[in-house]
A protein has these predicted regions:
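A detector of tandem-repeat and repeat-rich interaction/domain scaffolds
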Residues: 53, 64-65
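Alpha/beta-hydrolase superfamily serine-hydrolase fold, recognizing
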Residues: 1-48, 65-351
């Protein structure tokens, strides 16, 4: 039976209406089936139909730029293009901060899209970035190489390209903190969905490579980390599948590199992280959404952090679907509460 958001009374009524409208705009009731290989997936993404769907999505996310709920006034917004290691490719960073001379803590933000799609330059992310910046924070958003469709950079590459870009962007931010009015001792990594995956993986790489002391903390929202669904140990992966996102297929793993899932690589899919992988993590907040198929894997990851001796907390945002905080125009109050919670977590990590 097709999911009808208007009949799901767990959801905030505003999100019910928004999800119903998005379902109408998608114009397709066809089930999402597995793809045989990455080449087929790329060909479909670049077919006329795939390009049309991508353009529609980009238009929709662009239209979500809202200067009422997150004004540009009082902020300084810049873009930097930097070189990423080890490939020497170029990536873009969007920097949003209060227009003052004050040295501020920073949120290094990694956008969602399942590591496959989207861009931090889209209106919905720019609005979210401004909302966070209005909490008295500098925000650096990284546009890494997606693995299926381009962000603001043209290259499309599987794992570990996007992760390398996220690590490079963080290290550049730390090295250039003074020129941006950022306190290098107070840089927190955050991200939602695929960006939650990459924020966790970036934290692992920084620790592995001796840069863990450069990271203040971690704020992982609705992390997309197990790579294969549904899972009996994560009931929400079946109960909530189809609510905004559909995960019961192999698209994410195939696009990112199926061999990484089959090998249980925790840098690609942090569900596989061991206690040893996590024991040196900085203070971590995991934020999950009640009606998200990924809810239970986020909660399980939080519990694993506790087992590893990490200072960790978990919050559940009731009445919301996957990544609902990014719907700043639809539920600005919910978005703002999470933006304030990010600020609060920065302050708590700095104590």
């Amino acid at each position: 039976m097709k999911y009808d958001p208007m009949k799901d009374h767990r959801l905030d009524p505003r999100l019910r209406q928004a999800l119903a409208l998005m379902g109408q705009l998608s114009g397709s009731d066809e089930p999402i089936i597995d793809v045989p290989d990455r080449e087929t997936q790329l060909a479909e993404a670049n077919s006329p139909g795939g390009v049309a769907r991508r353009e529609m999505m980009e238009k929709m996310f662009g239209a979500m730029d809202n200067i009422v709920v997150a004004p540009k006034e009082g902020l300084r917004i810049e873009r930097h293009t930097i070189e990423s290691a080890p490939d020497g490719n170029r990536i873009n960073l969007s920097v949003i901060r209060p227009d003052t001379n004050e040295v501020l803590p920073c949120v290094y933000y990694i956008h969602g899209g399942g590591m496959m799609t989207l861009s931090c330059m889209f209106g919905t992310y720019q609005t979210w970035g401004r909302m966070i910046a209005h909490q008295g924070l500098a925000v650096v958003m990284v546009d890494f190489r997606n693995c299926l469709t381009p962000s603001s950079v043209p290259e499309v590459e599987p794992f570990p390209a996007g992760l390398n870009d996220c690590v490079s962007g963080f290290l550049w931010t730390h090295q250039n903190a003074a020129s941006m009015g950022i306190d290098p001792s107070r840089i927190l990594i955050a991200g939602e969905s695929g960006g939650g995956n990459l924020s966790i993986a970036t934290t692992m790489v920084l620790g592995r490579d001796g840069h863990g002391d450069k990271q203040l903390g971690l704020y992982a929202m609705c992390p997309y980390i197990s790579g294969q669904w549904p899972r009996e140990d994560y009931p929400s992966s079946a109960e909530n599948d189809g609510i905004f996102i559909t995960i019961g297929n192999n698209h994410g793993a195939m696009a990112y590199g199926m061999e990484e899932l089959e090998a249980g690589n925790p840098l690609a899919w942090p569900h596989f992280a061991t206690i040893e992988d996590l024991k040196d993590f900085p203070p971590t907040m995991v934020s999950v959404n009640e009606c998200d198929p990924l809810r239970d894997e986020g909660i399980a990851f939080y519990r694993k952090l506790l087992e590893a001796g990490v200072s960790a907390q978990c919050r559940q945002v009731m009445g919301t679907a996957h990544g609902a905080e990014l719907f700043c125009s639809t539920v600005p109050d919910i978005s703002r509460v999470t933006a304030r919670d990010i600020r609060g977590w920065v302050d708590q990590c700095a104590e």
